[in-house]
């Protein structure tokens, strides 16, 4: 197996001898090539699978050494640096997993990479299912293996995944067959024992030193199970798939499975026992095994064309993954803005200032580990928030405001705080797992966007947050969609908590309870506190006030206001 990484520049001969099609890389110089696609490719000329993995695994290392000959760990402005797998291995040194000197073979994280390769393949399949034909996917096969037979147009990986899925879903079937077929086989056949074995006579009674069991004819159920588990063991040894055939049957060695493939004996043997199976499960297993041997024999004989499931612009697939995780299809029409731009992720959740709902606006980012989000991306994200606010206000002006999200309070002329964020995939090389989202704030956050200082409730005062999320979790969740609704709720809650924390870092907030009717109090103070106060609801008995952290006199100014009954300094929750 060969493993390459997207967006990394390799020496061109390495790419060429791997059998990768020219469609999947670009030559920047005469002897260099950069991979521009992600996914799976089978190269018939080398009879091996090639996976191109996302650039998200690459981190910066220095290529300069200190006086003792060790690499300088931290890349700096004065030393040359390169992208490396886990920030440790140069990609051109670990691409060939058949090389016994490959340092990845001794790294415990290799199994995670191999598992991730299969998730990656399935994620592209899933994207294809959800979005139909798309120009970003290069796919020579259009049907997905589902256990049908030789007429299934499927890649070698499709067939292998179907075998692994069958193993996972039919454990009880194999145990049941083993018990049924074993019952009665060890009972003594006394007729055969008496006629075939010479007894020892002692005290006039015969004693038999050995016995004859009941006849056991060839059991085809067990034969196909032995072949199935032997193929799984072959896949484990040859392609490093994580599968442990835990059976009591003697298995066919992997070298003999390879010999069956090379000689064409696998399909011949399966054809000879085809009509011995009647249950749906064993018929399906026969079809899967036949598809496996037929494909493997074609490859061994050099009759297999190259096959690929590769995607350009994997960031589009990642965006779809995040939208499955946190998005809401109910608001897809709002995502498409009048200026032609499309918001990545849009959903509603509890407002930061009230029990009502507010739009959460997200943008997913797919970068290498050390690359920062800056420039145009930040500007566009602030623009998305402004557009959503305006679209919602336009809806209210056109129709009855009842039921619409309450962005603007007519009386204070203040605007609710708009949650706005980036969410970026990352891989922690020291904790690689598929089960934890590990959502955390980015190290480098973004300065608030505003027209006036000290006005958190002004329309143009916007806070933008950045979060990292475990890419492996996003990948596996996208493929499996296990516990989708609960995972979505938990993750949205974590995003909201992180945004609230960020807003609290910028502003001090107060709840002010007037001693006169709220409406009258607002009218009296509107000019003095425009953009600094906001009524959370038409029937609220208090008013939110907010000030920059640098404004140290706001508590006293509020206490000195006329008609104030109580002032509470609080943080948003």
Predicted regions: what is each one?
Residues 1-265, 281-299, 303, 456-457, ...:
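Terminal, charged accessory segments of proteins
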Residues 43-50, 347-361:
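Active-site beta-strand-loop-beta-strand hairpin of nuclease catalytic cores
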Residues 274-279, 302-321:
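A short, highly charged nucleic-acid-interacting micro-segment common to nuclease
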Residues 309-313, 333-337, 365-379:
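Short, contiguous acidic/charged loop-to-helix segments that flank catalytic cores in large enzymes
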Residues 320, 324, 379-386:
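Feature representing long, continuous alpha-helical segments
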Residues 323-346, 396-398:
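A short acidic/basic microdomain associated with nuclease active sites
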Residues 337-341, 353-356, 376-379, 411-417, ...:
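A structural signal for short secondary-structure junctions
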């Amino acid at each position: 197996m060969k493993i390459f990484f997207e967006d990394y520049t390799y020496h061109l001969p390495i790419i060429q001898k791997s059998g990768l099609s020219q469609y999947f890389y670009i030559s920047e110089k005469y002897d260099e090539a950069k991979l521009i696609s992600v996914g799976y490719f089978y190269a018939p000329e080398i009879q091996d699978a090639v996976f191109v993995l996302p650039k998200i695994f690459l981190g910066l290392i220095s290529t300069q050494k200190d006086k003792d000959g060790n690499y300088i760990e931290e890349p700096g402005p004065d030393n040359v640096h390169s992208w490396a797998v886990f920030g440790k291995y140069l990609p051109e040194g670990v691409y060939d997993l058949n090389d016994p000197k490959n340092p990845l073979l001794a790294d415990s994280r290799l199994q995670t990479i191999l598992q991730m390769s299969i998730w990656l393949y399935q994620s592209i399949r899933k994207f294809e299912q959800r979005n139909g034909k798309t120009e970003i996917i290069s796919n020579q096969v259009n049907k997905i293996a589902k256990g049908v037979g030789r007429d299934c147009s499927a890649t070698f990986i499709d067939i292998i995944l179907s075998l692994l899925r069958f193993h996972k879903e039919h454990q009880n079937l194999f145990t049941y067959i083993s018990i049924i077929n074993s019952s009665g086989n060890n009972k003594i056949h006394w007729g055969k024992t008496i006629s075939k074995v010479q007894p020892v006579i002692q005290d006039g009674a015969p004693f038999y030193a050995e016995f004859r069991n009941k006849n056991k004819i060839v059991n085809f159920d067990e034969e196909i199970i032995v072949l199935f588990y032997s193929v799984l063991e072959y896949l484990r040894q040859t392609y490093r798939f994580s599968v442990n055939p835990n059976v009591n049957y003697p298995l066919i060695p992997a070298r003999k499975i390879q010999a069956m493939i090379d000689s064409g004996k696998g399909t011949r043997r399966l054809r000879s026992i085809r009509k011995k199976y009647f249950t749906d499960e064993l018929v399906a297993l026969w079809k899967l095994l036949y598809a496996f041997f037929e494909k493997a024999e074609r490859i061994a004989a050099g009759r297999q064309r190259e096959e690929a499931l590769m995607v350009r612009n994997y960031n589009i697939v990642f965006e779809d993954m995040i939208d499955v995780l946190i998005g809401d299809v109910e608001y897809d029409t709002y995502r498409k803005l009048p200026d032609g731009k499309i918001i990545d992720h849009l959903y509603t959740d509890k407002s930061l200032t009230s029990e009502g709902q507010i739009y959460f606006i997200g943008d997913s980012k797919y970068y290498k580990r050390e690359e920062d989000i800056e420039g145009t991306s930040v500007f566009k994200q602030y623009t998305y928030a402004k557009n959503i606010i305006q679209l919602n206000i336009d809806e209210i002006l056109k129709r009855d405001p009842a039921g619409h999200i309450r962005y603007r309070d007519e009386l204070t002329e203040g605007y609710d705080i708009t949650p706005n964020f980036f969410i970026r995939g990352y891989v922690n090389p020291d904790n690689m797992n598929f089960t934890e989202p590990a959502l955390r704030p980015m190290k480098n956050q973004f300065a608030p966007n505003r027209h006036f200082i000290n006005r958190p409730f002004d329309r143009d005062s916007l806070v933008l947050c950045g979060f990292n999320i475990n890419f492996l979790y996003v990948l596996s969740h996208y493929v499996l969609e296990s516990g989708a609704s609960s995972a979505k709720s938990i993750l949205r809650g974590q995003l909201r908590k992180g945004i609230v924390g960020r807003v609290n870092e910028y502003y001090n907030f107060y709840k002010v309870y007037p001693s006169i009717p709220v409406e009258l109090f607002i009218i009296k103070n509107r000019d003095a506190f425009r953009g600094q106060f906001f009524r959370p609801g038409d029937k609220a008995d208090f008013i939110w006030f907010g000030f920059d952290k640098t404004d140290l006199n706001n508590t006293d100014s509020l206490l000195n206001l006329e008609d104030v009954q109580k002032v509470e300094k609080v943080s948003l929750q």
